[in-house]
């Protein structure tokens, strides 16, 4: 990755061509050195240390200036300044292969021995388990007379091999533990050796060496040595489970169900004590057929109680009297039921633990998918930001190819580079599906007008001779072809210049990046949705029940809001209407009643309007003549006085058209 002190693009390209031409004139290849601080590897002593490496020029040429700590503008005649970059182990944008260090080897060995993952670790640890098991079988066979001679001789050599193997493994474990910070140094190694499993390994190795050195006579063991070997074989079986996963699982189950276990054990213990005591009282004077008293002490009664309630039933002690048999039968049914409960509790606890682990695994699959979704969503959002930090990850410098400037190339070197790159991706745990999220490199063709006049491909071919597919070009200039396939074929020939600064990004580059980010977002969203799918029928049922519960809660909330906004029927409907029709409380019935009320109000308004019109007509003129003229006019079909009518949206009523006429006497 280029820093802010990198020269502009034009100067950088001129510097690159000048280095190539300088190598041709000096008949030597100039090693490109863009770093001012680099990891100096492959030294005289083979050591790898951080040291400033100054760029070296060709013979006869002045070396270019090294980048100072405080960069200052360099004169134009002193040549281009070298670019400054960080070591690949420091920069997160570097594409170089990580260097294998001592701590890296320690870490891999430590993970292989202490944190086994993968089929290789499984094969190794399973083989060790089989060897220990075979050795234990031979130790058992040595106790049988007909196999004692063969088993003892074979066991002698197997013990020697196992002692050497476990001793070497213990030393390697102690050495590899230094990769962790808490086990660094002498005190850290002592802390690692104080672990319980490490103490057991040390005891087994030392005791086995003592037994082999002291207890053996030639190629056979002494009797005491064989007894010691048997005990060490039992301890060696603990070596199989170094992580203690079995004990942690058992401890977690017991801790989770501790209340139930304590309750059942307490009640069962009380039943054992009471049953033993009452049987002792009933059978302490009873004599069996042989004339002995079987329950002569309370200890004999406790032994009988333990054998009975644990359903073993040796039958060495049996109640003789009917009182004792009755007490024993009653307490046995009660106590056995409580002594059998811990097995069921532990079994259900293990089943729940397995189910919990399965759920945790399913949930852990969602974490990378969610992280990818968040990352792609943020990148889609950041694509609209004009800040340079948004686009900086797309302008990183690609991996350096040492084959381009090699004076004597080897045909198989490119194949080896590909194999190393594939191995690196495999070591990093990168799957083909995850490679789609890698940041691509953006390149562009150098403009024609910025190329020096003295540059030619012929001079390039005379200095650096490569395979025809890399540097031999038929055309004299770097021209982009018409098809995308030809661009891919000539990618190595055209030597596209990588974009090394954000300012070199164009609009089509940014648009392409936005499209790629949007596609990555949709892919990540689909993967996250697939990871969110339930993996068991119980989860589906639980999901449906939870959805039904949420739906009922929302319906109740909606009903509450409707009652709050419209009101409950009991607040505005009289009791008489409730008793008449139970179905009138619906929304349709309520709307019908509202329409009826509006119609009644309209009729009453019509009547009131008619009465007002009549009063106005009587006040404006003579009521007799006006009334007569109005009626006559209406009977003759002439124009009718508009004051007798309602507004234009209603028709006159029968009472308006037939106004009662009064005589002259009534008018006076």
UniProtKB/Swiss-Prot annotation:
Catalytic activity: K(+)(in) = K(+)(out)
Modified residues (Phosphoserine): 27, 406, 408
Region listing for Interaction with AKAP9, in residue ranges: 587-615
Glycosylation sites: 288
Ranges for region Interaction with KCNE1 C-terminus: 534-571
Localisation per UniProt entry: Cell membrane; Cytoplasmic vesicle membrane; Early endosome; Membrane raft
BP-aspect Gene Ontology terms: adrenergic receptor signaling pathway; auditory receptor cell development; cardiac conduction; cardiac muscle cell contraction; cardiac muscle contraction; cellular response to cAMP; cellular response to epinephrine stimulus; cellular response to xenobiotic stimulus
Extracellular side: 142-152, 218-225, 283-298, 320-321
Membrane-side (Cytoplasmic) residue stretches: 1-119, 176-191, 242-259, 348-668
Keyword Kinase: no
One MF term in the entry's GO annotations: protein kinase A catalytic subunit binding
This protein's GO CC annotations: apical part of cell; apical plasma membrane; basolateral part of cell; basolateral plasma membrane; ciliary base; cytoplasm; cytoplasmic vesicle membrane; cytosol
Region (Interaction with CALM): 369-381, 514-528
Keyword tags: Calmodulin-binding, Cell membrane, Coiled coil, Cytoplasmic vesicle, Endoplasmic reticulum, Endosome, Glycoprotein, Ion channel, Ion transport, Membrane, Phosphoprotein, Potassium, Potassium channel, Potassium transport, Transmembrane, Transmembrane helix, Transport, Ubl conjugation, Voltage-gated channel
InterPro entries registered for this protein in UniProt: Ion_trans_dom, K_chnl_volt-dep_KCNQ, K_chnl_volt-dep_KCNQ_C, K_chnl_volt-dep_KCQN1, Volt_channel_dom_sf
Tissue: Expressed in heart, kidney and salivary glands. Detected in the cochlea. Almost undetectable in brain, skeletal muscle and liver. Widely expressed in embryonic and neonatal tissues. Expressed in choroid plexus epithelium (at protein level).
Main location: membrane
Region named Interaction with KCNE3: 237-245
Residues binding a 1,2-diacyl-sn-glycero-3-phospho-(1D-myo-inositol-4,5-bisphosphate), per UniProt: 243
Pfam families: Ion_trans, KCNQ_channel
PTM description: Phosphorylation at Ser-27 by PKA; increases delayed rectifier potassium channel activity of the KCNQ1-KCNE1 complex through a macromolecular complex that includes PKA, PP1, and the targeting protein AKAP9. Ubiquitinated by NEDD4L; promotes internalization. The ubiquitinylated form is internalized through a clathrin-mediated endocytosis by interacting with AP2M1 and is recycled back to the cell membrane via RAB4A and RAB11A.
Ranges within the bilayer without spanning: 299-319
Similarity remark: Belongs to the potassium channel family. KQT (TC 1.A.1.15) subfamily. Kv7.1/KCNQ1 sub-subfamily.
Domain notes for this protein: Each channel subunit contains six transmembrane segments (S1-S6) with S1-S4 forming one voltage sensing domain (VSD) and S5-S6 contributing to form one quarter of an interlocking pore-forming domain (PD). The segment S6 is involved in the inhibition of voltage-gated potassium channel activity by KCNE4.
Function, in words: Pore-forming subunit of the voltage-gated potassium (Kv) channel involved in the regulation of cardiomyocyte excitability and important in normal development and functions of myocardium, inner ear, stomach and colon. Associates with KCNE beta subunits that modulates current kinetics. Induces a voltage-dependent by rapidly activating and slowly deactivating potassium-selective outward current. Also promotes a delayed voltage activated potassium current showing outward rectification characteristic.
Annotated protein name in UniProt: Potassium voltage-gated channel subfamily KQT member 1
């Amino acid at each position: 990755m280029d820093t802010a002190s990198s020269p502009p693009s034009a100067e950088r390209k001129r510097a690159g061509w000048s280095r190539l031409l300088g190598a041709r004139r000096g008949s030597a290849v100039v090693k490109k050195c863009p770093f001012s601080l680099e990891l100096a590897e492959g030294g005289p002593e083979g050591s790898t240390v951080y040291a400033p490496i100054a760029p070296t020029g060709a013979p006869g040429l002045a070396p270019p200036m090294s980048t100072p700590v405080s960069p200052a503008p360099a004169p134009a005649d002193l040549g281009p300044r070298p670019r400054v970059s960080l070591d690949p182990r420091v920069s997160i944008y570097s594409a170089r292969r990580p260097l294998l260090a001592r701590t890296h080897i320690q870490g891999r060995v430590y993970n292989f021995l202490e944190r086994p993952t993968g089929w290789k670790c499984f094969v190794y640890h399973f083989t060790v388990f089989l060897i220990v098991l075979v050795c234990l079988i031979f130790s058992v066979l040595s106790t049988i007379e007909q196999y004692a001679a063969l088993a003892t001789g074979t066991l002698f050599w197997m013990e020697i091999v196992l002692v050497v193997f476990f001793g070497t493994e213990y030393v390697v474990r102690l050495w590899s533990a230094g990769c962790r910070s808490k086990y660094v140094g002498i005190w850290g190694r002592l802390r690692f050796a104080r672990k319980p499993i490490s103490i057991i390994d040390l005891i087994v190795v030392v005791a086995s060496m003592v037994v082999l050195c002291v207890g053996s006579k030639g190629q056979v063991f002494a009797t005491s040595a064989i007894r010691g070997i048997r005990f060490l074989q039992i301890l060696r079986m603990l070596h199989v489970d170094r992580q203690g996963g079995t004990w942690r699982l058992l401890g977690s189950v017991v801790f989770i169900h501790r209340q139930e276990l304590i309750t059942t054990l307490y009640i069962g213990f009380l039943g054992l004590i009471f049953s033993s005591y009452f049987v002792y009282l009933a059978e302490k004077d009873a004599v069996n057929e042989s004339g002995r008293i079987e329950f002569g002490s309370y200890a004999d009664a406790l032994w009988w109680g333990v054998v009975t309630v644990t359903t073993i039933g040796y039958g060495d002690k049996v109640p003789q009297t009917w009182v004792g048999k009755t007490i024993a039968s009653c307490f046995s049914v009660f106590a056995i039921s409580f002594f059998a409960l811990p097995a069921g509790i532990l079994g259900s606890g293990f089943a729940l633990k397995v189910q919990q682990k399965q759920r945790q695994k399913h949930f852990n699959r969602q974490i990378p998918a969610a992280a990818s979704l968040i990352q792609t969503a943020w990148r889609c959002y950041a694509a609209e930001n004009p800040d340079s930090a948004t686009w900086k990850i797309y302008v990183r410098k690609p991996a350096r190819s040492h084959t381009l400037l090699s004076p004597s190339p080897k045909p198989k070197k490119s194949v080896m580079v590909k194999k190393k790159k594939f191995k690196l991706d495999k070591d990093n745990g990168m799957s083909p599906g995850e490679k789609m999220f890698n940041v691509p490199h953006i390149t562009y063709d150098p403009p024609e007008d910025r190329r020096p006049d003295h540059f030619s491909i012929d001079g390039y071919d005379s200095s650096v001779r490569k395979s025809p597919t890399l540097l031999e070009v038929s055309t004299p200039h770097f021209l982009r072809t018409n098809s995308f396939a030809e661009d891919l074929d000539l990618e190595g020939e055209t030597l596209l210049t990588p974009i090394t600064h954000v300012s070199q990004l164009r609009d089509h580059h940014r648009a392409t990046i936005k499209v790629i980010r949007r596609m990555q977002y949709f892919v990540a969203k689909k993967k996250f949705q697939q990871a969110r799918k339930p993996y068991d029928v119980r989860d589906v049922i639980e999901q449906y029940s939870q959805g039904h519960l949420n739906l009922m809660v929302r319906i109740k909330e909606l009903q509450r809001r409707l009652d709050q906004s419209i009101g409950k029927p009991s607040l505005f409907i009289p009791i008489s209407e409730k008793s008449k029709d139970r179905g009138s409380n619906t929304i349709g019935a309520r709307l019908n009643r509202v329409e009826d009320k509006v119609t009644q109000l309209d009729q009453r308004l019509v009547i009131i309007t008619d009465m007002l019109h009549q009063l106005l007509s009587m006040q404006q003129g003579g009521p007799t003549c006006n009334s007569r003229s109005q009626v006559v006019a209406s009977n003759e079909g002439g124009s009718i006085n508009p004051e007798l009518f309602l507004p234009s949206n209603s028709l006159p009523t029968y009472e308006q058209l037939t106004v009662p006429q009064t005589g002259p006497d009534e008018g006076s």
